[in-house]
From Swiss-Prot:
Keywords: Cytoplasm, DNA-binding, Transcription, Transcription regulation. One of its GO terms (cellular component) is cytosol. Signal peptide: none annotated. PANTHER family: TRANSCRIPTIONAL REGULATORY PROTEIN YEBC-RELATED (PTHR12532:SF6), TRANSLATIONAL ACTIVATOR OF CYTOCHROME C OXIDASE 1 (PTHR12532). The keyword ATP-binding does not apply. This is Probable transcriptional regulatory protein CT1665. Belongs to the TACO1 family. It comes from the Bacteria. Pfam families: TACO1_YebC_N, Transcrip_reg. It comes from Chlorobaculum tepidum (strain ATCC 49652 / DSM 12025 / NBRC 103806 / TLS).
Length: 251
């Protein structure tokens, strides 16, 4: 799973430098709206909505925005109707890419995704072409400064911990079954252990290590996809060596 830890590190640094709050809020509003539409507006009985609200609050979204998004999802307020569509394909160096979207215009979205993939050195594939390479998991990052690896493992084993990654210098990455993400969050909260980026993630079974040129192209493509208004999340099985990471960080 070392590739996952490195990719998490890259994404964290990217988010710190180029996150656009307006774009982030748009994606969070869509997720809250869809979650409320699918599972109802009460977060206590809707784990997806509860996670979406927690993520929105962690990113300083005002409660008024959250409540309006919930009401649009439940039909109490008028608003756009979003459809969830997942696209699959390949990127530079042969990496697999999964693109999750939420859109009110399927034709616009597929044209945009196809254009971005083609321009970025990738190509769209058929449904299922790369999805089989990934497993959906719960993922949480816990600062190393907050707890030791042994104590964290002991704390979370009964709550649903599946794997604890410790390759990152600053964070442990906790992986769980999707249904166990909420119990693991609760265990951390009750123990007073801080955590970040609790989310549902797509974890690849294997990784493709890229050289500098392909890694640069892949990051540029993923960045372009993530900046599309209709894209909610992008997953890949890219990996890179420490030396490649160092080169890219200096650019």
């Amino acid at each position: 799973m070392s590739g996952h830890s490195k990719w998490a590190t890259i994404k964290r640094k990217k988010a710190a430098t180029d996150q656009k709050r307006g774009s982030l809020f748009t994606k969070l509003v869509k997720e809250i709206t869809i979650a409320a539409k699918m599972g109802g507006g009460d977060p206590t009985g809707n784990p997806r909505l509860r996670l979406a609200i927690d993520t929105a609050r962690a990113n300083s979204m005002p409660m008024d925005n959250i409540q309006r998004a919930i009401k649009r999802g439940t039909g109490e307020l008028e608003g756009a109707t979003y459809e969830e569509i997942t696209y699959e394909g390949y990127g530079p160096g042969g990496i697999a890419i999964i693109i999750e979207t939420a859109t009110d215009n399927r034709n616009r979205t597929v044209a945009d995704i196809r254009h971005l993939m083609s321009r970025g050195g990738g190509s769209l594939g058929e449904s299922g072409s790369v999805g089989w390479m990934f497993k959906r998991k719960g993922s949480i990052e816990v600062p190393r400064s907050a707890i030791s690896e042994d104590d964290l493992m002991e704390l979370l084993l009964d709550a649903g911990l599946e794997e604890l990654e410790s390759d990152d210098e600053q964070y442990f990455t906790v992986l769980t079954d999707v249904k166990d993400l909420e119990p693991v969050k609760k265990a951390l909260e009750e123990a007073g252990i801080p955590f970040e980026n609790a989310k549902i993630d797509m974890i690849p079974d294997n990784y493709v290590e890229l050289d500098v040129e392909n890694a640069r192209k892949a990051l540029k493509l993923i960045d372009a996809l993530e900046n599309s208004d209709d894209v909610q999340a992008v997953y890949s099985n890219m990996d890179m060596s420490e030396s490649v990471m160092s080169v890219l960080e200096e650019e």
